[in-house]
Amino acid sequence: MASVTNLVDSIVVVECGERWRARAEAAGRLLVLINNHTVELSGEHGSAGEFYSVLTDVGVRVACSSGYAIVLTQISGLLPVEPEPGNFSNVTFPENSAKYYTAYGIVDSGYRGVVKAVQFAPGINTSVPPGQMSLGLVLVKLARKSIHVTSIGSTRDGRTSEANLFYDYFAPKRVEDAGYDISAPEDATIDPDESHFVDLPIVFANSNPAVTPCIFGRSSMNRRGLIVLPTRWVAGRTCCFFILNVNKYPVSITKGQRVAQLLLTEDIDDALIPPTVNYDNPFPTYSPSESTKAPQSPVLWKFTTDFDREAPSSLRADGGFGSTGL
Protein backbone atom coordinates (compact mmCIF):
# COMPACT_ATOMS: atom_id res chain seq x y z
CA MET A 1 0.00 0.00 0.00
CA ALA A 2 1.35 3.43 -0.90
CA SER A 3 2.60 5.97 1.58
CA VAL A 4 0.49 9.02 2.30
CA THR A 5 3.18 11.11 0.64
CA ASN A 6 2.29 9.43 -2.67
CA LEU A 7 -1.32 10.60 -2.65
CA VAL A 8 -1.91 13.00 -5.52
CA ASP A 9 -2.04 16.61 -4.35
CA SER A 10 -5.53 18.10 -3.92
CA ILE A 11 -7.27 14.71 -3.80
CA VAL A 12 -8.91 13.77 -0.50
CA VAL A 13 -10.24 10.24 -0.02
CA VAL A 14 -13.49 10.34 1.97
CA GLU A 15 -15.65 7.71 3.64
CA CYS A 16 -18.97 9.03 4.99
CA GLY A 17 -21.35 7.02 7.14
CA GLU A 18 -25.15 7.03 6.93
CA ARG A 19 -25.60 9.27 9.98
CA TRP A 20 -24.15 12.25 8.09
CA ARG A 21 -24.43 13.61 4.56
CA ALA A 22 -21.53 15.33 2.83
CA ARG A 23 -21.00 17.48 -0.24
CA ALA A 24 -18.20 19.64 -1.60
CA GLU A 25 -18.68 23.40 -1.93
CA ALA A 26 -16.69 26.65 -2.35
CA ALA A 27 -14.66 25.51 -5.37
CA GLY A 28 -13.87 22.27 -3.59
CA ARG A 29 -12.11 23.91 -0.66
CA LEU A 30 -14.91 22.93 1.72
CA LEU A 31 -16.64 19.63 2.49
CA VAL A 32 -19.96 20.36 4.22
CA LEU A 33 -21.25 17.82 6.77
CA ILE A 34 -24.90 17.83 7.90
CA ASN A 35 -26.34 15.45 10.49
CA ASN A 36 -28.98 12.90 9.45
CA HIS A 37 -29.53 11.91 13.08
CA THR A 38 -30.17 13.64 16.38
CA VAL A 39 -26.84 14.63 17.92
CA GLU A 40 -26.87 14.43 21.70
CA LEU A 41 -24.55 16.91 23.38
CA SER A 42 -24.98 15.76 26.96
CA GLY A 43 -22.65 16.41 29.87
CA GLU A 44 -21.67 13.34 31.87
CA HIS A 45 -21.84 15.11 35.22
CA GLY A 46 -22.27 18.50 36.82
CA SER A 47 -25.13 20.93 37.02
CA ALA A 48 -27.35 22.69 34.52
CA GLY A 49 -25.88 25.84 33.10
CA GLU A 50 -22.29 24.60 33.00
CA PHE A 51 -20.40 24.61 29.72
CA TYR A 52 -19.67 20.99 28.79
CA SER A 53 -17.18 19.60 26.30
CA VAL A 54 -18.44 16.67 24.25
CA LEU A 55 -16.54 14.57 21.71
CA THR A 56 -18.80 14.20 18.66
CA ASP A 57 -18.28 11.57 15.97
CA VAL A 58 -18.79 13.44 12.68
CA GLY A 59 -19.11 10.24 10.66
CA VAL A 60 -16.23 10.59 8.20
CA ARG A 61 -12.74 9.30 7.62
CA VAL A 62 -10.45 11.31 5.36
CA ALA A 63 -6.98 10.98 3.84
CA CYS A 64 -5.09 13.83 2.23
CA SER A 65 -1.55 14.40 0.99
CA SER A 66 1.18 15.16 3.52
CA GLY A 67 1.44 18.59 1.92
CA TYR A 68 -2.00 19.45 3.28
CA ALA A 69 -4.01 19.57 6.49
CA ILE A 70 -7.76 19.67 7.09
CA VAL A 71 -9.37 22.16 9.46
CA LEU A 72 -12.65 21.10 11.08
CA THR A 73 -14.93 24.06 11.73
CA GLN A 74 -18.53 24.96 12.40
CA ILE A 75 -20.37 26.49 9.45
CA SER A 76 -22.23 29.70 10.29
CA GLY A 77 -25.87 28.71 10.56
CA LEU A 78 -27.77 26.00 8.75
CA LEU A 79 -27.84 24.79 5.18
CA PRO A 80 -31.11 24.22 3.31
CA VAL A 81 -31.82 20.55 2.69
CA GLU A 82 -33.95 20.85 -0.46
CA PRO A 83 -33.16 21.79 -3.10
CA GLU A 84 -29.38 21.57 -2.89
CA PRO A 85 -27.76 24.78 -4.14
CA GLY A 86 -24.89 24.69 -6.58
CA ASN A 87 -23.03 27.21 -4.46
CA PHE A 88 -23.51 29.40 -1.41
CA SER A 89 -24.19 32.66 -3.23
CA ASN A 90 -27.95 32.67 -2.55
CA VAL A 91 -27.99 30.87 0.79
CA THR A 92 -28.69 32.65 4.06
CA PHE A 93 -27.28 31.34 7.32
CA PRO A 94 -29.67 31.74 10.28
CA GLU A 95 -28.37 31.98 13.84
CA ASN A 96 -27.31 28.79 15.61
CA SER A 97 -30.56 27.93 17.41
CA ALA A 98 -29.07 24.89 19.16
CA LYS A 99 -26.52 27.06 21.00
CA TYR A 100 -23.67 24.64 20.54
CA TYR A 101 -20.09 25.63 19.77
CA THR A 102 -17.35 23.78 17.92
CA ALA A 103 -13.64 24.23 18.53
CA TYR A 104 -11.41 24.38 15.47
CA GLY A 105 -9.71 21.03 14.98
CA ILE A 106 -6.77 19.96 12.84
CA VAL A 107 -6.85 16.64 10.96
CA ASP A 108 -3.29 15.52 10.22
CA SER A 109 -2.63 13.84 6.88
CA GLY A 110 -1.61 10.63 8.64
CA TYR A 111 -4.80 10.20 10.69
CA ARG A 112 -7.04 7.35 9.48
CA GLY A 113 -9.61 7.11 12.24
CA VAL A 114 -13.08 8.65 12.38
CA VAL A 115 -12.90 12.43 12.67
CA LYS A 116 -14.31 13.78 15.92
CA ALA A 117 -15.25 17.32 16.89
CA VAL A 118 -14.78 18.83 20.34
CA GLN A 119 -18.04 20.66 20.96
CA PHE A 120 -19.47 22.67 23.83
CA ALA A 121 -23.03 23.22 24.99
CA PRO A 122 -24.63 24.75 28.11
CA GLY A 123 -26.68 22.50 30.37
CA ILE A 124 -26.63 18.73 30.66
CA ASN A 125 -29.00 17.82 27.82
CA THR A 126 -28.66 19.58 24.48
CA SER A 127 -30.05 17.81 21.41
CA VAL A 128 -29.46 18.89 17.83
CA PRO A 129 -32.24 17.59 15.52
CA PRO A 130 -31.47 16.08 12.09
CA GLY A 131 -30.39 18.68 9.55
CA GLN A 132 -29.61 21.27 12.24
CA MET A 133 -25.85 20.77 12.67
CA SER A 134 -23.57 22.02 9.91
CA LEU A 135 -19.84 21.39 10.11
CA GLY A 136 -17.14 21.77 7.52
CA LEU A 137 -13.79 20.27 6.57
CA VAL A 138 -11.53 22.87 4.92
CA LEU A 139 -8.47 21.72 2.98
CA VAL A 140 -5.41 23.87 3.71
CA LYS A 141 -2.11 23.70 1.84
CA LEU A 142 1.02 23.62 3.98
CA ALA A 143 4.21 25.49 3.19
CA ARG A 144 7.16 23.37 2.14
CA LYS A 145 9.70 25.35 4.16
CA SER A 146 9.81 26.82 7.65
CA ILE A 147 10.17 30.52 8.39
CA HIS A 148 13.16 32.48 9.72
CA VAL A 149 12.51 33.33 13.35
CA THR A 150 14.59 35.80 15.36
CA SER A 151 14.43 37.44 18.76
CA ILE A 152 12.72 40.80 19.21
CA GLY A 153 14.64 43.67 17.66
CA SER A 154 16.88 41.57 15.44
CA THR A 155 14.92 42.13 12.23
CA ARG A 156 15.60 45.40 10.43
CA ASP A 157 14.35 46.45 7.00
CA GLY A 158 13.16 42.92 6.29
CA ARG A 159 16.64 41.49 6.87
CA THR A 160 17.65 39.21 9.71
CA SER A 161 20.82 39.64 11.71
CA GLU A 162 20.64 36.53 13.88
CA ALA A 163 20.54 32.78 13.42
CA ASN A 164 17.18 31.13 12.89
CA LEU A 165 15.60 30.40 16.29
CA PHE A 166 12.64 28.46 14.87
CA TYR A 167 13.44 25.14 16.55
CA ASP A 168 14.29 26.86 19.82
CA TYR A 169 10.56 27.54 20.21
CA PHE A 170 8.79 24.98 18.01
CA ALA A 171 9.28 21.22 18.26
CA PRO A 172 10.23 19.36 15.06
CA LYS A 173 7.31 17.56 13.45
CA ARG A 174 6.87 14.34 11.53
CA VAL A 175 6.01 14.33 7.84
CA GLU A 176 2.41 13.32 8.59
CA ASP A 177 1.90 16.04 11.21
CA ALA A 178 0.29 19.32 10.21
CA GLY A 179 1.69 21.54 12.93
CA TYR A 180 4.72 22.23 15.08
CA ASP A 181 4.06 21.90 18.81
CA ILE A 182 4.19 25.06 20.93
CA SER A 183 5.08 24.59 24.60
CA ALA A 184 4.00 26.82 27.47
CA PRO A 185 6.88 29.18 28.34
CA GLU A 186 5.92 29.27 32.04
CA ASP A 187 3.62 27.82 34.67
CA ALA A 188 0.20 29.44 34.81
CA THR A 189 -3.16 29.00 36.50
CA ILE A 190 -6.11 30.23 34.45
CA ASP A 191 -9.18 31.30 36.41
CA PRO A 192 -12.73 30.40 35.27
CA ASP A 193 -13.90 32.34 32.21
CA GLU A 194 -10.53 34.09 32.02
CA SER A 195 -7.86 34.14 29.31
CA HIS A 196 -4.13 33.58 29.63
CA PHE A 197 -1.93 35.50 27.19
CA VAL A 198 1.03 33.59 25.76
CA ASP A 199 3.65 35.85 24.22
CA LEU A 200 6.85 34.35 22.82
CA PRO A 201 9.64 36.94 22.38
CA ILE A 202 10.25 36.16 18.72
CA VAL A 203 9.29 37.59 15.34
CA PHE A 204 9.56 36.18 11.83
CA ALA A 205 10.98 37.75 8.71
CA ASN A 206 8.30 38.24 6.08
CA SER A 207 10.70 37.20 3.32
CA ASN A 208 8.18 34.81 1.77
CA PRO A 209 4.72 36.44 1.65
CA ALA A 210 3.22 33.18 0.37
CA VAL A 211 3.75 31.58 3.80
CA THR A 212 1.20 32.43 6.50
CA PRO A 213 1.90 31.14 10.03
CA CYS A 214 -1.27 30.29 12.00
CA ILE A 215 -1.75 29.11 15.57
CA PHE A 216 -4.35 26.50 16.51
CA GLY A 217 -5.29 24.63 19.66
CA ARG A 218 -4.93 20.95 20.47
CA SER A 219 -7.73 18.42 20.97
CA SER A 220 -6.39 17.45 24.39
CA MET A 221 -6.52 21.08 25.52
CA ASN A 222 -10.00 21.57 24.05
CA ARG A 223 -11.29 18.55 25.96
CA ARG A 224 -9.99 20.09 29.19
CA GLY A 225 -11.93 23.27 28.44
CA LEU A 226 -8.79 25.23 27.55
CA ILE A 227 -9.43 26.84 24.18
CA VAL A 228 -6.63 28.41 22.15
CA LEU A 229 -8.13 31.28 20.16
CA PRO A 230 -7.11 30.39 16.57
CA THR A 231 -5.11 33.24 15.11
CA ARG A 232 -2.51 34.34 12.62
CA TRP A 233 1.02 35.12 13.62
CA VAL A 234 1.22 38.58 12.11
CA ALA A 235 4.49 39.61 10.49
CA GLY A 236 6.45 42.02 12.66
CA ARG A 237 4.64 40.99 15.84
CA THR A 238 5.66 38.56 18.52
CA CYS A 239 4.20 35.06 18.43
CA CYS A 240 1.20 35.54 20.69
CA PHE A 241 -2.15 33.90 21.40
CA PHE A 242 -4.78 33.53 24.11
CA ILE A 243 -5.87 30.44 26.04
CA LEU A 244 -9.42 30.70 27.41
CA ASN A 245 -10.60 28.61 30.36
CA VAL A 246 -14.32 27.89 29.80
CA ASN A 247 -14.60 25.79 32.96
CA LYS A 248 -16.16 26.91 36.25
CA TYR A 249 -12.94 26.14 38.11
CA PRO A 250 -9.26 27.15 37.74
CA VAL A 251 -7.04 25.05 35.48
CA SER A 252 -3.24 25.01 35.55
CA ILE A 253 -0.73 24.54 32.76
CA THR A 254 2.95 23.82 33.35
CA LYS A 255 6.09 25.12 31.70
CA GLY A 256 6.99 22.89 28.75
CA GLN A 257 3.47 21.50 28.35
CA ARG A 258 2.27 21.33 24.75
CA VAL A 259 -0.54 23.86 24.55
CA ALA A 260 -0.88 24.84 20.87
CA GLN A 261 0.43 24.14 17.38
CA LEU A 262 1.86 26.29 14.61
CA LEU A 263 0.78 25.59 11.03
CA LEU A 264 2.75 27.14 8.18
CA THR A 265 0.18 27.58 5.41
CA GLU A 266 0.38 28.73 1.82
CA ASP A 267 -3.19 29.55 0.86
CA ILE A 268 -5.15 30.08 4.07
CA ASP A 269 -8.57 31.65 3.54
CA ASP A 270 -9.16 34.98 5.29
CA ALA A 271 -12.67 33.74 6.12
CA LEU A 272 -11.10 30.88 8.08
CA ILE A 273 -8.27 32.78 9.79
CA PRO A 274 -8.57 36.60 9.51
CA PRO A 275 -5.32 38.53 8.88
CA THR A 276 -5.18 39.98 12.40
CA VAL A 277 -4.59 38.73 15.94
CA ASN A 278 -7.64 37.01 17.42
CA TYR A 279 -8.32 38.72 20.75
CA ASP A 280 -11.85 37.60 21.56
CA ASN A 281 -13.32 34.72 19.50
CA PRO A 282 -12.68 31.20 20.87
CA PHE A 283 -15.19 29.51 18.55
CA PRO A 284 -15.00 31.08 15.07
CA THR A 285 -17.42 29.89 12.41
CA TYR A 286 -16.68 29.63 8.71
CA SER A 287 -18.96 31.60 6.39
CA PRO A 288 -18.39 30.47 2.80
CA SER A 289 -19.51 32.80 0.03
CA GLU A 290 -18.73 33.66 -3.57
CA SER A 291 -15.75 35.63 -2.28
CA THR A 292 -14.31 32.57 -0.55
CA LYS A 293 -10.74 32.17 -1.70
CA ALA A 294 -10.44 29.34 -4.22
CA PRO A 295 -7.63 26.82 -3.67
CA GLN A 296 -4.55 27.08 -5.86
CA SER A 297 -5.29 23.64 -7.30
CA PRO A 298 -8.75 22.12 -7.86
CA VAL A 299 -9.74 19.91 -4.93
CA LEU A 300 -11.38 16.53 -5.46
CA TRP A 301 -13.15 14.93 -2.51
CA LYS A 302 -13.13 11.30 -3.67
CA PHE A 303 -15.90 9.37 -1.94
CA THR A 304 -15.39 5.66 -1.37
CA THR A 305 -17.03 2.71 0.37
CA ASP A 306 -13.66 0.95 0.71
CA PHE A 307 -11.58 3.52 2.58
CA ASP A 308 -9.05 1.03 3.95
CA ARG A 309 -8.12 -0.04 0.42
CA GLU A 310 -8.16 3.34 -1.32
CA ALA A 311 -6.58 5.50 1.39
CA PRO A 312 -2.78 5.30 1.51
CA SER A 313 -1.28 3.68 4.58
CA SER A 314 0.19 5.88 7.29
CA LEU A 315 2.38 5.56 10.35
CA ARG A 316 -0.24 7.05 12.64
CA ALA A 317 -3.25 5.13 11.24
CA ASP A 318 -6.20 5.57 13.63
CA GLY A 319 -4.07 6.46 16.65
CA GLY A 320 -5.56 9.35 18.64
CA PHE A 321 -9.06 10.66 18.23
CA GLY A 322 -8.78 13.35 15.53
CA SER A 323 -9.47 16.13 14.74
CA THR A 324 -5.86 16.28 15.98
CA GLY A 325 -5.80 13.39 18.41
CA LEU A 326 -5.55 13.32 22.20
Curated annotation (Swiss-Prot):
CDD domains: trimeric_dUTPase
GO molecular function terms attached to this record: dUTP diphosphatase activity; metal ion binding
Catalysed reactions, semicolon-separated: dUTP + H2O = dUMP + diphosphate + H(+)
UniProt keyword terms in alphabetical order: Hydrolase, Magnesium, Metal-binding, Nucleotide metabolism
EC number, as in UniProt: 3.6.1.23
The keyword Hydrolase is assigned to this record: yes
Cofactor or coenzyme needed: Mg(2+)
Annotated GO biological process: dUTP metabolic process
Enzyme class: hydrolase
The family this protein is said to belong to: Belongs to the dUTPase family.
Function according to Swiss-Prot or TrEMBL: Involved in nucleotide metabolism: produces dUMP, the immediate precursor of thymidine nucleotides and decreases the intracellular concentration of dUTP to avoid uracil incorporation into viral DNA.
Name of the protein in its database record: Deoxyuridine 5'-triphosphate nucleotidohydrolase
Gene name of this polypeptide: DUT
